[in-house]
Each structure stands twice: as C-alpha cells, then as structure tokens.
A protein has these predicted regions:
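A conserved acidic beta->alpha catalytic loop
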Residues: 26, 41-51, 70, 100-101
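Non-catalytic, C-terminal membrane-associated alpha-helical segments of glycosyltransferases
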Residues: 256-308
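Short beta-strand-to-loop acidic/aromatic patch adjacent to the donor-nucleotide binding site
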Residues: 89-99
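Glycine-rich, basic loop-to-helix element that forms the pyrophosphate-binding segment
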Residues: 68-88
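A recurrent flexible, glycine/aromatic-enriched loop bordering the glycosyltransferase active site
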Residues: 153-173
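Conserved donor NDP-sugar-binding/catalytic core segment of glycosyltransferases
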Residues: 105-136
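Short, acidic, metal-binding catalytic loop of nucleotide-sugar glycosyltransferases
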Residues: 25-35
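A short, conserved alpha-helix in the catalytic core of glycosyltransferases
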Residues: 171, 177-181, 187-214
Length: 308
C-alpha cells in the first residue's frame, strides 16, 4: 500500500535554466518513479519557459510549469509549490531548489521511512567534493559538528539521524503534515523560511530525520559558516545585500517565535561582532542592523528595497 502512494516533486527556480535542466534530469532518472513534477518559476528573465519547451518538458502530463507574476523568492516559490501539490491531492511532496541534484536512488532510499507525520531529508553533499557535507551538520543536543561522510561513519549511526535535516534540499513530507502545519511563510522571501518551516514541524511534533543512505548533491557556498569569535562560532556571510538583509530579519523573527530573547540578543551580538571585528564592513553592518530592526518589529515589507 505504501508503494502506491503518489509523490510530486516541487522545484523552485529563478534564472538558472541549465541547472534546472540537470535537476529535472535527475528527477526523471529516479529509481522510485515520481507521480508528477511541478516547477515554480519565480518570473525568470533568462527564457526558462522557452528553454523547457525546447527540451520537451512542457508537453507531458507528468510535468507542470507555474510561472509566477513576480519574483517571490524561495519562500514564495515553496509556498506556491506546496500549495499546488496539496490542492491537487498528491500524498507526498519532495522539495528542492533548481541547483540540487538528487542521486538516482535518493527517493527510493527516503521513501521507505516516510510516514504521514514525518519530515525527512537526505544527506546533502558538496557536488564538487561529494565526500564532504555541503552544509555542516551539528548533532542535536551536542556540540559535535560533522563536516564529512567520514565524520558520520565514525559514529556508526544506522539508518537515520533523528532531529535534524537540511531543509528544502530533497525534503520529503506528506500532505497530511501540510494539512496540520500549513505552508511556508512567503513574506520571508529568502533565507530563513526553511528554518522557520522546520521549527514549525518541531512545534507540531512532526518527526524529523536525515536518512544516512540517501544522497543529494548541491553546490557549496564557501562564505557560509565563516569562522569568528576566536574560531568558536560561525557566521553565514554573503556578498548579497538582499540575502544579508533577509537573513538578519528572518533569523530575528525565528528566534522570537521559536527560541527566546536570549537567542535574539546572541544573534545581534554575533552579527555586530562579525561586521565590526571579524570582517569589518560598515555597509554590511548597516544592512544587518536594518534587518535586525525590522525582524524585531515584525516588518516584512522592506526586502524589495534590495531587489534589482
């Protein structure tokens, strides 16, 4: 009965048509066949729709392209994608960005663990160095940081790591979970919407786990996890004004909702330290402070100031 359940993949894209094509090829090659694929195009300007027509994707009942009237960011894209799948009655939803590439057996290794009340992720590996994690993993309730597959294998963890996922990179969840938890917050626009959705899962007591034999490949951003504070802490620096602003605003919002004001103060301290002492930048500090202020105020209207 489990094997008969329908699964729809949601891919959010913006101006990366060649990477999108790689992602779609990997989805089509899955050994556990998908029921449907929906691509949410965030009003791309690189000819994404025509490109998909040229590569014979749009003439299939297996595939749906939804082009949004404006760029709503990853948060808006996943909001609309999950909403589409939920409203069309699919049993399970598989989430990813256009630059992700699941291994051919990724879904086949995830799906046996799927229930109507869990939120599963694969291991997310650096597409150029697949023996390393794309995003370092910190085991729940510990200070243990995992950077490589060898780090994980040394722990002899069987089947799954409970309590942790790298959200929206090959995440598998059921429509029953969406019915209970709702959709991602589109007002977040980008950066932090995935963490908010995962925190909401925990609040609703949805089981969370990473499946250790399921692999998902993704480009690594070297600016993420920059060491600071005598190498005791790490900060997600970015050259993008938009991402920096949204990260600070959304992180404050998430800490207010799901952590404590101590966490809010810690994030503020960490950000001020980083752009004052670790990598001094008055312009970035100004953007970060603006994001922090709007996060405290619950104002989600100003990210458009940084859209080109």
């Amino acid at each position: 009965m489990h094997a008969e359940k329908s699964i729809c993949a949601v891919v959010v894209t913006f101006n990366r048509k060649k990477l999108l094509l790689n992602c779609l090829g990997a989805l089509k090659a899955q050994t556990r066949q998908l029921s449907h694929i929906v691509v949410i195009d965030n009003a791309s300007t690189d000819g994404t729709a025509d490109f998909l027509v040229q590569h014979n994707w749009t003439n299939s009942d297996f595939f749906t392209l939804i082009t949004l009237p404006e760029n709503m960011g990853g948060a808006g894209g996943f909001h609309e994608g999950i909403k589409y799948v939920f409203e069309h009655g699919f049993d399970y939803i598989w989430l990813m960005d256009d630059d992700g590439v699941p291994a051919n057996d990724c879904l086949a290794r995830l799906f046996p663990f799927a229930t109507e009340n869990n939120y599963l992720g694969p291991l997310v590996l650096d597409i150029k160095q697949p023996n390393k994690f794309c995003f370092p993993m910190r085991l729940p309730s510990t200070l243990k940081r995992l950077d490589t597959l060898a780090d994980l294998r040394a722990l002899e963890i069987k089947e799954k790591i409970d309590g942790i996922v790298i959200p929206f990179n090959g995440i598998l969840l059921s429509s029953k979970v969406v019915e209970k938890v709702g959709f991602p917050l589109k007002e977040y626009f980008i950066w932090g919407d995935d963490m908010e959705y995962t925190a909401r899962m925990k609040r609703y007591r949805v089981e969370i786990a990473s499946i250790v034999d399921a692999y998902f490949y993704h480009p690594k951003d070297e600016s993420l996890g920059t060491p600071m504070f005598f190498n005791k802490l790490h900060f997600n620096d970015t050259p993008s004004k938009l991402k920096l602003y949204c990260m600070c605003r959304n992180a404050i919002s998430n800490h207010k909702k799901y952590s404590s004001y101590l966490h809010v103060l810690a994030f503020i301290f960490k950000t001020l330290w980083f752009y004052s002492l670790t990598k001094p930048s008055f312009s970035k500090l100004s953007i970060a402070v603006r994001g922090i202020f709007h996060g405290i105020m619950g104002d989600f209207t100003h990210h458009k100031d940084y859209l080109k």
